[in-house]
Regions:
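Short, ordered coil/turn segments that flank beta-strands lining enzyme active or ligand-binding pockets
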Residues: 374, 433, 453
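Residue-level detector of functionally pivotal "anchor" positions at catalytic/ligand-binding pockets or at interdomain
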Residues: 410-436
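C-terminal tail/sorting-segment detector
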Residues: 1-8, 13, 445-462
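Bacterial Sec-dependent N-terminal signal peptides
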Residues: 1-32, 415
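Surface-exposed loops/turns
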Residues: 71, 444-445
């Protein structure tokens, strides 16, 4: 076979030149940063000015490289922005981003199964994301920014960029009317070394957190404002076994955290609400904590409500909650200041049928601190049965006393005045009006509850 070595040699020299020319003819996509001169950009505008960072693709707009909206500039999402696909890029908002959608839900997608885009709001102002849909993201960080998410859906997020779908640092974003489903990490999180008080209102949290021991809402210390978690439904339906509902923790003693947990339904998780650490004051009102038993070992979880204090500055007021079907109803651990109802302000919590190992544990005061729990409904009017469902000083002298009398149903108990010797107490169980069990032979003048095999009544010993 004849070979022209001269031609072969010339092709070897020509090939690098051809590749260089092809490279020059192929558009290179680098990141783009807006000028910071007060300009408002739509995605249609970005196609014109970003030199290929934003283009028009098969389904709508495509973001091919990192994009930054500088301080002073605005990214506007309008009805003409139906869909945006993202490569594995970071979109940073240092200026502002707002949506004017009225009829169309703008959808942000990862470009394919391996591309997970990220967003970062840092020192951003007046951001309002409304009527949007985010899918296949790697996380959204909100850092010292003013951001509202309203009627936004978040699905299939990984944990590649942030721990939660929305990670919050040193700010108080509003997250309302939103839906979080099947994301790998918590829906909303904030760190232990920052302060954030998100306003989480009327949202649905559906089976978030995959293969990690974490709640769907996982918050560190609050800022000056109150953390408000109001009107949400938090649940798991796809057998995500070790997923808790809500946790608020101040493990480093940062600031003074205030929490309003109100009118939520928290069900079918590893636990309902966990409050842990140093200085936290919460009002827990009107919630339903249902069937939170997804824990193999009851020693590791399963409470409807758990208050774990490292000081008595860990405080909670509980009113009008329904707590049933959990491994433990309420657990109070170490140090705390818990008010479940007083004689002047009844708790009116409904607490019953919380059990594990064949034993009912509606309230476990695993602490030396006393606990007021007056005016609650325990699923029975039998004081002895209520007592058997509460673990406290009567069971272990090292524990604090739980005062549960009067309770809802005790009003119907007959009351009589007797002298010593007028009633046979040999087969009776006697409680003080604070719910403390006492020996019948040591009764002093006062009002008592006497429980016998045939019923219960109040007795007054003059």
């Amino acid at each position: 076979m004849f070979v022209n070595f001269k031609t072969q040699f010339n092709m070897k020299k020509l090939l690098p030149i051809l590749l260089f020319i092809i490279g020059l003819c192929t558009p290179l996509t680098a990141q783009w940063t807006s000028p910071g001169n007060g300009t408002t950009f739509t995605f249609a505008d970005l196609v014109e000015v970003t030199d290929g960072v934003v283009t028009i693709g098969e389904n709508g707009y495509v973001v091919n490289a990192d994009l930054t909206i500088s301080t002073g500039d605005v990214l506007e999402i309008n009805n003409q922005t139906a869909r945006v696909d993202f490569a594995e890029v970071l979109v940073t908002i240092n200026g502002s981003m707002f949506c004017t959608n009225t009829s169309t839900r703008t959808r942000f997608y990862g470009l394919n199964e391996t591309n997970h885009f990220s967003m970062r709001f840092e020192n951003a102002i007046a951001c309002n994301l409304k009527k949007m849909y985010f899918s296949d993201g790697a996380g959204i960080k909100v850092i010292e920014s003013d951001v509202t998410f309203d009627d936004v859906k978040f699905v299939y997020f990984t944990r590649d960029y942030s721990t939660g779908v929305i990670d919050i640092f040193n700010c108080d974003p509003v997250i309302k009317n939103c839906y979080f489903m099947l994301n790998d990490g918590p829906a909303i999180s904030s760190p232990a070394n920052g302060q954030a008080s998100p306003q989480i209102l009327n949202c649905d949290f559906d089976t978030n957190v995959k293969d990690i021991n974490s709640p769907q809402i996982n918050l560190g210390p609050g800022s000056d404002d109150t953390i408000r978690i109001v009107g949400n439904e938090i649940y798991t339906i796809y057998a995500q076994w070790y997923v808790g509902g809500v946790s608020v923790a101040d493990l480093m003693g940062i600031g003074s955290t205030k929490v309003l947990l109100k009118d939520n339904i928290i069900r079918d998780g590893r636990y309902g609400y966990n409050q842990q650490g140093m200085t936290i004051s919460s009002v827990i009102e009107g919630n339903q904590f249902l069937d939170n038993f997804h824990e193999d070992n009851p020693m590791n979880g399963g409470s409807g409500i758990s208050i774990y204090g490292t000081s008595t500055n860990n405080k909670a007021i509980l009113r009008n909650n329904l707590i049933t079907g959990n491994l433990w109803g309420i657990t109070a651990i170490y140090q705390h200041d818990i008010d479940m109802g007083t004689e002047d302000d009844w708790g009116r919590n409904e607490i019953h049928d919380n059990s594990n190992g064949g034993v009912t544990y509606d309230l476990y005061n695993n602490s030396a601190c006393d606990l007021m729990a007056v005016g609650n409904q325990w699923g029975t009017a039998n004081a002895e049965e209520i007592e058997s469902h509460i673990v406290h000083k009567n069971d272990d002298p090292s524990l604090g006393l739980v005062t549960f009398y009067p309770y809802i149903g005790s009003e119907s108990l007959a009351e009589s005045t007797i002298d010593h010797g007028q009633i046979d107490l040999s087969s009776a169980t006697v409680f003080t009006i604070t719910g403390q069990r006492v020996r019948p032979e040591s009764l002093k003048p006062g009002l008592y509850i006497v429980v016998t095999p045939t019923g219960a009544k109040k007795i007054l010993i003059p």
